[in-house]
Amino acid sequence: METSLHKAPQKRQVTAIIFLLLLWEAGSATITYSVLEETDRGSLVGNLAKDLGLSLRELITRGAQILSKGNKQLLQLEQKSGNLLLKEKLDREELCGSTNPCILHFQVLLKSPVQFIQGEIQLQDVNDHAPEFMEDEILLKILESSLPGAVFPLKIAQDLDVGSNTVQNYTISTNAHFHLLTRNHSDGRKYPELVLDKALDREEQAQIRLTLTAMDSGSPPKTGTTQVVIVVLDINDNAPEFAQGLYEVQVQENSPVGSLVLTVSARDLDAGTHGELSYSLFQSSNQVLQAFEVNTDTGEIRVRKLLDFEEIQSYRMEIEASDGGGLSGKCTVVIHVMDVNDNAPELTMSVLISEIPENSPETIVAIFGISDPDSGDNGKMVCSVQDRLPFLLKPNEENFYTLVTERALDRESRAEYNITITVSDMGTPRLTTQHTITVQVSDINDNAPAFTHTSYTMFVRENNSPALHIGTISATDSDSGSNAHITYSLLPPHDPQLALNSLISINADNGQLFALRALDYEALQAFEFHVGATDGGSPALSSQALVRVVVLDDNDNAPFVLYPMQNASAPCTELLPRAAEPGYLVTKVVAVDRDSGQNAWLSFQLLKTTEPGLFSVWAHNGEVRTTRLLSERDVPKHRLLLLVKDNGEPPHSASVTLHVLLVDGFSQPYLPLPEVARDPAQEDVLTLYLVIALASVSSLFLVSVLLFVGVRLCRKAGETSLGGCSVPEGHFPGHLVDVSGTGTLSQSYQYEVCLTGGTGTNEFKFLKPVLPNFLNEGGYRNTEENSNFRDSLGFS
């Protein structure tokens, strides 16, 4: 490709040709570009994508990057097009000096996977410098006795360009005595020699002035001129001569300014002023003139500025010794600069990834190059990082290294690493360079939230206020950022009957649990559910914990008396035989409390009784017992008021009224069964059963009466006296029980007990007494008392 460069001041056009070369050597590819110096910034060097055989997508995906030696980047890669552009205008003389060819090295880094491709730019010289003489006038003294053919070297011109653009030829102005020859130095430089064609005559012309022109071969060529003044001298027989024509010496590059390098010596056999010598540099380059100086009187060559082996390894110069008569002699001095380990290794960071994911082994952290301009062992380098760090250095081509992770990192264990890269050379003493980089380990969502407990137990007292805070669950996540942001939730309960969403709510941000409504211990003593903690990562991770809510009982239920049932229409009556001993069990009050714990601990107390001191109740089991023997003075009917109280705070109580009927000769206490709650559906069936049973008993009773009457009529025995007692003979049904006692009730009663276990009800039916033929007064009185007794109980 061709690029036209316009230089405004001169209004001329310079054509720059940029071409691409692919070199394949030793199985590796080197991309070589050729660029003219002074090409404008941003100019196209080549299309890197095409030159590498990659598509633009591949070039971007693989993370192509241009690396230059040193810290100065000369090229830039245009990602959207794959073009390689100049980052700045390049000056060959500044970058390479007199070195030819001028080659600038760079590397192409493909990051994924890592691959280095060597590249170089051959910086082509343009003729942007004209030859220039260091002196405006060159003084040359020649003896008039010099013979034709004598050669007189002249000082050279300097041209910073190289190749054909540097000095290629010298010319001298037309004259009658001299012609000019252009010679080649061993280093390739051109120098002029003046050749005498015709003998000189001082008396005829004591001084001759000539114009010396230096010309390069650029396009267009450039020239430089100086004046040569030739002074014709009288005859002088002897010219100065050096002890040797070539001097070679070595000097350390760290030699201080002013240090002695070499002393050259010449002698002149003439006496007087013709034997006095002066020394000077002759036909020397700018580099020599800047680095060394010669003592004109002693011939000592001393260091003029600090030398640098890495810049120039040797100097070649001509030393001229001139006597007072104008004659001179010359010698060549070659100074070799010796390398010392004066340069510490340099580290140039090309790629630095300051944040890497925690779970990726062999992840590229940095790519860097190291260099040491010293030579030999002074330029050999070793590179390392600290021990016990999970990082490895992998060497690449041309002193490039890749720093990678040795294994997967764990941000939760260590979130930051300070890595010190140490580069040491092998010189004596060793010089070291250290570069510290900080690498942050980025988080990935590799840790699920962890609850502080696997299960939580929370207590809430029943009858709580709605929205009551009952407890808090807590989970932690070792990750960071959104990966550690935890959201709490209620998980569906295992029991489908548990309406969890109507009982409990949870704050999704902080895990606080609230009771949505008042809880009832008697309906629900405890329930369990699971809570979940989910982080904000992608994909999200979660965990769960068990929460058990225990409802604490409040004393909100009064005791309930199961037995005896309190029914206003039919008060419960217990029968107590008058012959009962003290401690006789009259009945037992049975009560329950729907509360629990001490709220359900019941105690019994006798509050009120018809006959104080006759009855007592056991506080813990509700048994009503007699406290003494009954007497004739005790009224036959007693009313007891009992209190059933729980142990809650505040306590609740219930009262029960008990009727006790004193009877003579009753051998067993009357133990009515408590009436329990019945299902209305069962009550109809039980009623039917009861009617059937009642009809059966009535029929049996009627048959018994008829049998009894028949037996009485058939008896042939006479009636007994008034003091006797007629006892019916024959078989009595099993439901007729003799209750004859020793007391006041000497008559025989028959009674029917109807007990139905299913209903818990009881009925007593007293029949009329079977009266013998009592004619005495006592028998009448007893009958009257019994009648009164019946009436008081409401029996007929």
Swiss-Prot record:
InterPro entries: Cadherin-like_dom (IPR002126), Cadherin-like_sf (IPR015919), Cadherin_C (IPR032455), Cadherin_CS (IPR020894), Cadherin_N (IPR013164), Protocadherin/Cadherin-CA (IPR050174). Glycans are attached at N169, N184, N418, N567. GO terms for molecular function: calcium ion binding. Pfam families: Cadherin, Cadherin_2, Cadherin_C_2. The keyword Secreted does not apply. One of its GO terms (biological process) is homophilic cell adhesion via plasma membrane adhesion molecules. Residues 35-133, 138-242, 247-347, 352-451, 456-561, 568-671 form the Cadherin domain. The chain crosses the membrane at residues 691-711. Residues 30-690 are extracellular. PROSITE patterns: CADHERIN_1, CADHERIN_2. SMART domains: CA. Residues 712-796 are cytoplasmic. Gene3D superfamilies: Cadherins. Disulfide bonds join C96-C102. It is found in: Cell membrane. Residues 1-25 form the signal peptide. Keywords: Calcium, Cell adhesion, Cell membrane, Disulfide bond, Glycoprotein, Membrane, Repeat, Signal, Transmembrane, Transmembrane helix. GO terms for cellular component: plasma membrane. It is a single-pass type I membrane protein. Potential calcium-dependent cell-adhesion protein. May be involved in the establishment and maintenance of specific neuronal connections in the brain. PANTHER family: CADHERIN-87A, PROTOCADHERIN BETA-14. This is Protocadherin beta-14.
